C-alpha cells in the first residue's frame, strides 16, 4: 500500500471517529433532556443581562495637519536685506517676515512717474492744438483734415498716458511688496531663503501655519460612511501623549470615494488651544455613532426564533424558561443586539446550543 493510500485511510478513520463522537454526544444531551436530567452548562455558555451605554465605533487613523497654512512667495525680484524669523518662531499678524532692498524698486517708481508726467504734458499740448484747430475750422481758416489729425494725436497720447499710469501703479505695488508681513498669527514651519540672497519673482520664501486648530485626514470605508455625520464627536489619542485623549469633531466629508482604496476622506477638526499638538503627529481615534444609553444588549447567538417569534432562554430556578424579546439596534462590530423583554440581572443562555429546549433543568458549572 502506498504512503498516499495510508494517509487517506488514516484521515477517513479520524473523520469517522469524530462523527461517531459527535452523534453520541448529541444523543446523550438529548437523552438527558428527555429524561429530565439536568444539563450542565459552562459559565461561558450564559451571560447576566446588564444595562450599558452602547455605540457603533468607526476607527479614525491619520496624521495631524494645520487647517490654516500659507506659503509665502516673493512678489518682486530683489535682494533680501532683512530676515528676522527662523523655523519654529511664533509670529503675530502684521509682523515683518522679509524685507527686500528697495533702491531699484524706488527708482522704477520714480522713472515711471517721470515718463507719465512727460506724457501728461504732451497730452495737454495736443489738446490745446486740437482746440485751436477746431476754432479755426469753424471760421474756415483750417481744414477738417487738420482738425482730425490733431484729434488723433490727442487720442493716441491719452492712451499712452493711461498705459504709463498703469505702469506707475505696478511699480508702486512692487515697492509695497518690498516688505512681507504675516497675514495671520502662527508659527514658521519652513524657510527656503537666507538673508543676502537675491531671489527672482515668485520664489518660495517660507511657510506659516496656524496651530490653534488642526485636522486629521482619515480614510473611512464606504460601508461605514452612512454612520458618519457632520459635527459628530471623536476621541483621539496622539503619539507622545500616552493616557491622554483629545476631542475633535467631523468637519468635512468628501463627496466621493478614492478610486484605489474605495475609502472616503473624512476630516476631523481638533482644537489645540494649549499648543501641545504639532502637524505630522500620528493619531488614532474612535468616532462613536448611534449612541444608545442604558440599554440591554445580548450576543446575537442568544437570540432564538420559532413560530411565535423571537425569544431567549432564561435560567430561572435551575430551569430554562422561554422569554419573548423584541429586537432593536445591532452592533455588528461587537456581535451584540439590543433587546427588550429582558430585565437586568437575568441569566440568559448566550452560547449557540440548538438542542436546549424550554423547561429543561440545568446547572451552571461553578455555581
UniProtKB/Swiss-Prot annotation:
Alphabetical list of InterPro entries matching this protein: CusB_D23 (IPR032317), RND_pump_MFP (IPR006143)
Pfam families: HlyD_D23 (PF16576)
Name of this protein: Nodulation protein NolF
Stored SUPFAM superfamilies: HlyD-like secretion proteins
Keyword Metal-binding on entry: no
Alphabetical UniProt keywords: Nodulation, Plasmid
GO molecular function, one term: efflux transmembrane transporter activity
Disulfide links within the chain: none
Family: Belongs to the membrane fusion protein (MFP) (TC 8.A.1) family.
Top-level taxon of origin: Bacteria
Gene expressing this chain: nolF
A single GO cellular-component term on record: efflux pump complex
Main function: Involved in the production of Medicago-specific nodulation signal molecule.
Amino acid at each position: 500500500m502506498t504512503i498516499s493510500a495510508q494517509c487517506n485511510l488514516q484521515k477517513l478513520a479520524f473523520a469517522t471517529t469524530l462523527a461517531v463522537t459527535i452523534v453520541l454526544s448529541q444523543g446523550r444531551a438529548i437523552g438527558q433532556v428527555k429524561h429530565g436530567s439536568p444539563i450542565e452548562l459552562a459559565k461561558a455558555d450564559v451571560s447576566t443581562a446588564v444595562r450599558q451605554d452602547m455605540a457603533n465605533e468607526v476607527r479614525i487613523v491619520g496624521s495631524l495637519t494645520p487647517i490654516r497654512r500659507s506659503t509665502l512667495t516673493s512678489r518682486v525680484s530683489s535682494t533680501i536685506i532683512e530676515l528676522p524669523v527662523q523655523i519654529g518662531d511664533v509670529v503675530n499678524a502684521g509682523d515683518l517676515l522679509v524685507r527686500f532692498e528697495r533702491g531699484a524698486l524706488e527708482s522704477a517708481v520714480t522713472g515711471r512717474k517721470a515718463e507719465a508726467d512727460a506724457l501728461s504734458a504732451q497730452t495737454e499740448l495736443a489738446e490745446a492744438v486740437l482746440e485751436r484747430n477746431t476754432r479755426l475750422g469753424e471760421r474756415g481758416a483750417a481744414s477738417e483734415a487738420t482738425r482730425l489729425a490733431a484729434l488723433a494725436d490727442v487720442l493716441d497720447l491719452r492712451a499712452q498716458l493711461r498705459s504709463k499710469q498703469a505702469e506707475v501703479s505696478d511699480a508702486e505695488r512692487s515697492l509695497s511688496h518690498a516688505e512681507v508681513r504675516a497675514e495671520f498669527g502662527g508659527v514658521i514651519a519652513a524657510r527656503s531663503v537666507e538673508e543676502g540672497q537675491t531671489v527672482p519673482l515668485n520664489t518660495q520664501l517660507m511657510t506659516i501655519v496656524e496651530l490653534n486648530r488642526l485636522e486629521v485626514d482619515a480614510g473611512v470605508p464606504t460601508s461605514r460612511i452612512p454612520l458618519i455625520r457632520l459635527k459628530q464627536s471623536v476621541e483621539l489619542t496622539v503619539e507622545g501623549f500616552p493616557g491622554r485623549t483629545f476631542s475633535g469633531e467631523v468637519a468635512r466629508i468628501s463627496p466621493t470615494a478614492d478610486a484605489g482604496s474605495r475609502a472616503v476622506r473624512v476630516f476631523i477638526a481638533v482644537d489645540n488651544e494649549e499648543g501641545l499638538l504639532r502637524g505630522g503627529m500620528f493619531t488614532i481615534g474612535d468616532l462613536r455613532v448611534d449612541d444608545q444609553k442604558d440599554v440591554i444588549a445580548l450576543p446575537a447567538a442568544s437570540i432564538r426564533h420559532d413560530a411565535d417569534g423571537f425569544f431567549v432562554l432564561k435560567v430561572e430556578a435551575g430551569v430554562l424558561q422561554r422569554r419573548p424579546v423584541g429586537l432593536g439596534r445591532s452592533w455588528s462590530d461587537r456581535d451584540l443586539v439590543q433587546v427588550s423583554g429582558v430585565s437586568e440581572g437575568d441569566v440568559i443562555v448566550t452560547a449557540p446550543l440548538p438542542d436546549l429546549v424550554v423547561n429543561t433543568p440545568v446547572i451552571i458549572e461553578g455555581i
